[in-house]
From Swiss-Prot:
Biological process annotations from GO: pollen exine formation; pollen tube growth
Family: Belongs to the major facilitator superfamily. Proton-dependent oligopeptide transporter (POT/PTR) (TC 2.A.17) family.
Family annotation (SUPFAM superfamilies): MFS general substrate transporter
Membrane-crossing segments per the record: 57-77, 92-112, 132-152, 178-198, 206-226, 321-341, 374-394, 404-424, 437-457, 481-501, 529-549
Name of this protein: Protein NRT1/ PTR FAMILY 2.8
UniProt keyword annotation of Transmembrane present: yes
GO MF annotation: an example: transmembrane transporter activity
UniProt KW keywords: Membrane, Transmembrane, Transmembrane helix, Transport
Pfam family name, one: PTR2
Coiled coil stretches, renumbered: none
Domain of life: Eukaryota
Organism: Arabidopsis thaliana
Length: 559
């Protein structure tokens, strides 16, 4: 495995010998096996914690949301380690190993009854709670899985993007296709996880159901290592996050400096140590330009490099900061999208657990975790139709290969419709259960199909568009940062959900009846919470239309 410097000549030479689609197949395989394993847990985690650990109510939702958030916020640490020390290859490999150990712990919790509390006969009235040490074992497995996700998520798509030369039109076209097929391939893995593995967990054995994803992670690691001879591996050249803090600090220290015509800016050395020149961005956030102003010749050493890196930063470091700030207005819109998908991953599954799950003439029992499959199938069908049918037809008609713009994809109102539908479906489910006097509503689980399908379309339009926007607008050396920022939006969404749920629970509990506090959804008012989420989606659409859309349509690159 060769390590590539980022100078243009060596970059072009190595790209001729390595990278491209022959490297991508190993990277996508690694991602697919990893996603198959992780979604085998994520898709059924609510069911496992509720049925095997007797968790429920706000505590159950808090555990899942905080874990979701931790998985995603640790992508910042993963991106930092990748950029500053290990590089993307080793960060991906070590992250996969951490996930493997974490999943192994989950397999042990399923195999050893002593690691779990005693089972409950009546799920609506259960007092058998897990001991603190049992929760400690459970949380250690979740923690290792979060660490693994922090290493894999920011680097996988960035490592894949490294395999293409985006300075050419052909390379850019390959990269755009890679985005969609990357999403499609792991969606196929999710379909397998949410059908076969979730079915085994629910109806056959939790032990086998966790051994399978553990084995998948072993395959993910093996496949990734086998392909190492085909990879273009960019050298770790320092953390962009650390540079951003340095720029802010240096600019604040020089806040009284007034730019003039006789000002000298510190360009900094090139990647091979030789002098270089860069064009300074003069139009945005000019305050931070002060960080690269040489106010005293003593700030430079004999080689012309900065002596004090917290007082003098290069023009490139300032540009990196401006790249990040330029994408923030559009990035914020992704948070609302992930708030929506979090509801389906948690409350959607809890709804399914309290509905009639029989299907067909033979009364087949549909696992509640299968409902996430609807979202993934919808997403996969849309991407396949879009890439293989819609675009070729449009090209035949117009003679040009037209695609939906980023602005149009984000403006799709699927999220608003999804939560309104979910709210009315929950009202119907709850009313039927109360009328019937039962924990499980006689309403069929099939009634949840529309809201899960709409959630899949929301992700297909908004999440894929956001991922593409962040990756394309960042320079090559900041692609791991783009991946981390993408998952940071999901992390913030999970923490917002946690805060929102606890605030709603506290406020409504004071009024005498909590909307979300009971383990039995029939005693809650979940539909009101869904309508609040719909309101957040409306506010997000207005924010994008009135403010952020201008940043989505800018043609200027971040490099």
């Amino acid at each position: 495995m060769d390590v590539e410097s980022s100078s243009p000549s060596s970059h072009a030479l190595i790209k001729k010998e390595k990278g491209g689609w022959r490297a991508i197949k190993y990277i996508i395989a690694n991602e697919s096996f990893e996603k198959l394993a992780s979604m085998s847990l994520i898709g059924n985690l609510s069911v496992y914690l509720m049925t095997k650990y007797n968790l429920g109510g706000v505590f159950l939702v808090n555990v899942i949301n905080i874990w979701f958030g931790s998985c995603n916020i640790l992508t910042l640490a993963g991106a930092f380690v990748s950029d500053a020390y290990l590089g993307r290859f080793w960060t991906l490999l070590l992250g996969s190993i951490a996930s493997f150990i974490g999943m192994g712990i989950f397999a042990l919790t399923a195999a050893l009854p002593s690691l779990r509390p005693d089972a409950c006969i009546d799920p609506s009235n259960c007092s058998n709670q897990p001991a603190k040490w049992q929760l400690g074992v459970l949380f250690s497995g979740l923690g290792l899985l979060a660490i693994g996700a922090g290493g894999v998520r920011p680097c996988n798509i960035a490592f894949g993007a490294d395999q293409f030369d985006t300075s050419t039109k052909k390379g850019k076209a390959h990269l755009e296709t890679f985005f969609n097929w990357w999403y499609f391939s792991f969606t196929v893995a999710l379909v397998i996880a949410l059908t076969g593995v979730v079915y085994i967990q629910t109806n056959i054995s939790w032990v086998i159901g966790f051994v399978i994803p553990t084995a998948c992670l072993a395959l993910s690691i093996t496949t990734f290592v086998i392909g190492q001879h085909t990879y273009i591996c960019a050298k770790a050249e320092g953390s962009v996050f650390a540079d951003i803090v340095k720029v802010v600090t240096a600019a604040c220290k020089k806040r009284k400096v007034k730019p003039g015509s006789d000002i000298t800016f510190y360009i900094g050395p090139s990647n091979d140590g030789s002098p270089t020149t860069l064009v300074r961005d003069k139009h945005r956030l000019r305050f931070f330009d002060k960080a690269s102003i040489v106010t005293n010749p003593n700030e430079l050493n004999e080689d012309g490099n900065a002596k004090y890196k917290w007082r003098l930063c290069s023009v490139q470091q300032v540009k990196n900061l401006k790249c990040v700030t330029a994408i923030l207005p559009v990035w914020v819109t992704g948070i609302a999208c992930f708030i929506l998908t979090d509801q389906q991953n948690i409350y959607g599954i809890l709804q399914a657990m309290q509905m009639d799950k029989t299907f067909g003439p033979h009364n087949f029992q549909v696992p509640a975790g299968w409902m996430n499959l609807v979202s993934m199938i919808t997403l996969a069908i849309w991407i396949s139709l879009y890439e293989c049918v819609i675009i070729p037809i449009v090209k035949q008609i117009t003679g040009r290969k037209k695609r939906l713009t980023l602005k149009h994809r984000i403006e799709i109102v699927m999220g608003i419709i999804c939560m309104i539908v979910a709210g009315f479906q929950e009202k119907k489910r709850r009313a039927s259960a109360l009328k019937n006097g039962s924990f499980v509503s006689p309403v069929s689980i099939v009634m949840l199909l529309p809201q899960f399908a709409l959630a899949g379309l929301t992700e297909a339009f908004s999440a894929v568009a956001l991922m593409e926007f962040l990756t394309v607008r960042m320079p090559e050396h900041m692609r791991a940062v783009a991946g981390a920022i993408f998952f940071l939006s999901s992390s913030i969404a999970s923490y917002i959900c946690t805060l929102l749920i606890n605030v709603i629970d506290a406020v409504t509990r004071k009024e005498g009846k909590s909307w979300l506090g009971d383990k039995d959804l029939n005693k809650n008012r979940l539909e009101n919470y869904f309508f609040i989420i719909a309101g957040i989606q409306v506010a997000n659409l207005l924010y994008f239309r009135l403010f952020a859309s201008r940043y989505a349509t800018e043609n200027k690159k971040g490099h």
